[in-house]
UniProtKB/Swiss-Prot annotation:
Transmembrane segments: none annotated. It is found in: Cytoplasm. It comes from Salmonella typhimurium (strain LT2 / SGSC1412 / ATCC 700720). GO terms for molecular function: DNA binding; DNA-binding transcription factor activity. PANTHER family: HTH-TYPE TRANSCRIPTIONAL REPRESSOR FABR. GO terms for cellular component: cytoplasm. InterPro entries: DesT_TetR_C, Homeodomain-like_sf, HTH_TetR, HTH_transcr_repressor_FabR, Tscrpt_reg_HTH_FabR. Homodimer. This is HTH-type transcriptional repressor FabR. Residues 10-70 form the HTH tetR-type domain.
Length: 210
């Protein structure tokens, strides 16, 4: 990559980080202005268009980055699990660490999931589907259950985890610890229920084939 391309990428990165830094519990992406983001990034507003077509393209890039960041962290968690440790507890801890370290990235995913922009809703839905698919792949490999079962289990788990994540954004450390324990219990119940359901279906098939 040439010097000019490196500088362009650096400025683009600065714009993304500037936009993330301006999000908060009180401030959504829709309320950000191009001028404010450019000023925070240290460039002239007119220079913004060298990097993004408009503010929406910047927002979609942020959604993609947030989803990718979360998926990469969860992959790392699964690698740690392979070396020993509780699958569910390690995954929950990793997820809560992500929220603690990147609250604005998670806020963006939560808000735009049901926001007014169809493009943003589709982008967040796509990221969540990637997340579900990767978890279903892992469950299929580890639990030796058919795809239909692992997809249903993964979708239920992700729904509960995202709901807990929304709650975790606005509570203190002790409440978050209690939330983690509750979440671990809920996910274990889903996992055991999915396995029990699968075993019962297998027994039905075996019974009918006799």
């Amino acid at each position: 990559m040439g010097v000019r391309a490196q500088q362009k990428e650096k400025t683009r990165r600065s714009l993304v980080e500037a936009a993330f830094s301006q999000l908060s519990a009180e401030r959504s992406f829709a309320s950000l202005s191009l001028r404010e983001v450019a000023r925070e990034a240290g460039i002239a507003p007119t220079s913004f268009y060298r990097h993004f077509r408009d503010v929406d393209e910047l927002g979609l890039t942020m959604v993609d980055e947030s989803g990718l960041m979360l998926r990469q962290l969860m992959r790392q968690a699964r690698q740690r699990i392979a070396k020993g440790g509780s699958v569910i507890r390690t995954s929950v801890s990793t997820f809560m660490e992500f929220i603690g370290n990147n609250p604005n990235a998670f806020r963006l995913l939560l808000r735009e999931r049901s926001g007014t922009s169809a493009a943003f809703r589709a982008a967040v839905a796509r990221e969540i589907q990637h997340f579900i698919a990767e978890l279903a792949d892992y469950l299929e490999l580890e639990n030796h259950m058919p795809r239909a079962f692992t997809e249903a289990q993964a979708e239920a788990m992700v729904t509960i985890v995202f709901s807990a994540g929304a709650e975790a954004l606005d509570i203190g450390a002790e409440q978050r610890r209690q939330l983690e324990e509750r979440l671990v219990l809920q996910l274990r119940m889903i996992a055991k229920g999915a396995y029990y359901w699968y075993r019962r279906e297998q027994e039905k098939i075996a019974h009918h084939s006799e």
